[in-house]
């Protein structure tokens, strides 16, 4: 699902409402694409998303990638248009295959989390402007919602208190 708005705070609020974060439901992980603007080989995104299983010096918590930490919750990605092309290709391959393999682990694991992408404009507009690859846009889906509209709809008492996470399950 793509949430677009020019204000990051509004995007985060809309994503949190879709996730049901305020009710303390499933886990929530975030990744800011600006951190990966210089990840020319895609090494850092591989470790951030997939994590590493080996290594004695690392604590178990530091080895888990964002996908493992998110579990069946939500992975909230911001500024993916700012990621290096190699980092976006790795993101695409993980989302398209719906599985990932942590570093040092021979067995792939399924991606079970909901992925919400926050951008300043809809993904299709970014692809037409050559800021994103069409393959990634097609894989992330064609559901594009304006953040302000989500907040307006979900903050009405009856809808928000019913089942906010079921609304995002279709994403």
Enumerate the language-model features and the residues they cover:
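Conserved catalytic core of Hanks-type protein kinase domains
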Residues: 69, 94, 135, 139
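Conserved post-Walker A coupling segment in P-loop NTPases
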Residues: 1-57, 71-74, 81-82, 143-156
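Conserved Walker
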Residues: 55-67, 79-81, 86, 95-112, ...
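Hydrophobic/aliphatic anchor position in the core parallel beta-sheet
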Residues: 74, 100, 115-116
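An anion/phosphate-binding loop that grips the pyrophosphate of nucleotide cofactors and donors
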Residues: 70, 118
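Nucleotide-binding/hydrolysis machinery
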Residues: 5-14, 18-26, 104-114, 120-171
